[in-house]
């Protein structure tokens, strides 16, 4: 007996019973983003490995441990994208979208990281990413946050809270980095292996550690907010004022640093406790140096990404899972000549009634078996064509969801109007 093949660990099939919820979420996001003037961009899921090493940072968990990297037949090192911002910036530079232009872009699709699979965390996961270019002020940071807050309302999410921070300029961060190294070196005995590894390469990431044994040394660390440059401080105060004016509640978290090296100034996360352990459902910030870092001209930029699996889990935890759409009608056919007539009728109904969900019986079978299939499909009506209906030019309509509903013969040329009245 041959081995049964299964999906790769951490990579899941989305089955027909679940796809309506995905489609509903995706449609809500599409409509909202269009309303704010954002345009869709689609990038490859495979990029040169160098793109992520240069953008995310070589001394990060993603690049060091989590990327799916392989060598193609030409000897080039390629990587399945672990996030979308770097690819979006690469596309913007390559196609001339960014020079002296403002852009509001978004994308949707799978990302890949070789992490330990757990609740809300997968090796193939899906994100909606939003990126803005050419806008330097705190107003665009506020717009991104306000946009996500509106999406939470559209989706009926309540158990999410916003944390914000500022990482300052590159120069201010370098000076703060030296202070941080000095602080952690003085408490080296409590640092875990991961923190010691990061101490001289990426000390800000130590602030993001979840190790309870390091909680006190992290809490007592100097705050980056106390060492911001004046421009970054003014930018952050402007953002806080705009969010307050918009009625957006937030908490300033000085330990919020984000896991990607390209962030500067504003960073933010939307967090929930509704999925068990604290989880981030949306995160972003500014990355003003990334376009130049990847070979373009200096361009201010900001964006965010949200995980669809986590959002769907939140929606379902709140009891708001959208119902799966069911067929309006199921067409049952039995007898000589009925299949050809049934296919012609189905197409004429689809022409007359855009949006009609009509399933035509396939694979034959008697009327009894077909009506059982119709019932299992969830259709409201069974449309029946037998040899007698074919000869008389009628369709027998049988209600499937009405207690005591009586079947009736409807003339073929009046069926479209009959269905329009039933389905609206």
From Swiss-Prot:
- Enumerate the GO terms in the molecular function aspect: ATP binding; histidine-tRNA ligase activity
Top enzyme class, one word, equals ligase
Q: What is this protein called?
A: Histidine--tRNA ligase
The alphabetized UniProt keywords are: Aminoacyl-tRNA synthetase, ATP-binding, Cytoplasm, Ligase, Nucleotide-binding, Protein biosynthesis
**InterPro entries documented for this protein:** aa-tRNA-synth_II (IPR006195), aa-tRNA-synth_II/BPL/LPL (IPR045864), Anticodon-bd (IPR004154), Anticodon-bd_dom_sf (IPR036621), His-tRNA-ligase (IPR015807), HisRS-like_core (IPR041715), HisRS/HisZ (IPR004516), HisRS_anticodon (IPR033656)
Localization recorded for this chain is:
Cytoplasm
Q: Name one GO biological process term.
A: histidyl-tRNA aminoacylation
Lineage per the UniProt record: Bacteria, Pseudomonadati, Pseudomonadota, Gammaproteobacteria, Chromatiales
One GO cellular component assignment for this chain's record is: cytoplasm
Under catalytic activity, the entry for this protein gives: tRNA(His) + L-histidine + ATP = L-histidyl-tRNA(His) + AMP + diphosphate + H(+)
Q: Which organism is it from?
A: Thioalkalivibrio sulfidiphilus (strain HL-EbGR7)
EC number(s) on record?
Answer: 6.1.1.21
Family statement drawn from the similarity comment of this UniProt entry: Belongs to the class-II aminoacyl-tRNA synthetase family.
Question: What is the annotated quaternary arrangement, including any partners?
Answer: Homodimer.
């Amino acid at each position: 007996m041959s081995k049964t093949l299964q999906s790769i660990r951490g990579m899941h099939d989305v089955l027909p019973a679940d796809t309506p919820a995905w489609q509903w979420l995706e449609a809500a996001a599409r409509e909202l983003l269009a309303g704010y003037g954002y345009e869709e961009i689609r990038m490859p899921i495979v990029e040169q490995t160098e793109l992520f090493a240069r953008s995310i940072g070589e001394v990060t968990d993603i690049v060091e441990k989590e990327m799916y990297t392989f060598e193609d037949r030409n000897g080039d090192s390629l990587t399945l994208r672990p996030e979308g911002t770097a690819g979006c910036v690469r596309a913007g530079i390559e196609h001339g979208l960014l020079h002296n232009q403002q852009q509001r872009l978004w994308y949707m699709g799978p990302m890949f990281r070789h992490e330990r699979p757990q609740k809300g965390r997968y090796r193939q996961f899906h994100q909606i990413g939003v990126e803005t270019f050419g806008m330097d002020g705190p107003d665009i940071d506020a717009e991104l946050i306000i946009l996500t807050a509106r999406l939470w309302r559209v989706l009926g999410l309540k158990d999410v809270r916003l944390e914000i921070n500022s990482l300052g300029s590159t120069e201010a961060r370098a000076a703060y980095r030296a202070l941080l190294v000095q602080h952690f070196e003085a408490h080296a005995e409590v640092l875990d292996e991961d923190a010691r590894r990061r101490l001289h390469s990426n000390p800000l990431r130590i602030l993001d550690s979840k190790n309870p044994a390091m909680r006190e040394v992290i809490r007592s660390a100097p705050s980056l907010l106390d060492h911001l440059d004046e421009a970054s401080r003014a930018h952050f105060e402007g953002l806080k004022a705009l969010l307050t004016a918009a009625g957006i509640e937030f908490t300033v978290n000085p330990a919020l640093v984000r896991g990607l090296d390209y962030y500067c100034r504003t960073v933010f996360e939307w967090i929930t406790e509704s999925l068990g352990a604290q989880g981030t459902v949306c995160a972003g910030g500014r990355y003003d140096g990334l376009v130049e870092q990847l070979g373009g001209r200096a361009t201010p930029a900001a964006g965010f990404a949200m995980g669809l699996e986590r959002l769907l889990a939140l929606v379902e935890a709140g009891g708001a899972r959208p119902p799966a759409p069911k067929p309006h009608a199921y067409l049952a056919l039995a007898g000589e000549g009925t299949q050809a007539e049934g296919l012609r009728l189905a197409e004429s109904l689809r022409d007359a009634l855009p949006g009609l969900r009509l399933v035509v019986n396939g694979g034959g079978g008697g009327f009894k078996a077909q009506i059982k299939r119709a019932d299992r499909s969830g259709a409201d009506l069974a449309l029946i064509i037998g040899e007698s209906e074919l000869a008389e030019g009628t369709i027998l309509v049988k209600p499937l969801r009405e207690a005591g509903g009586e079947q009736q013969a409807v003339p073929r040329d009046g069926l479209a109007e009959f269905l329009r009245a039933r389905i609206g």
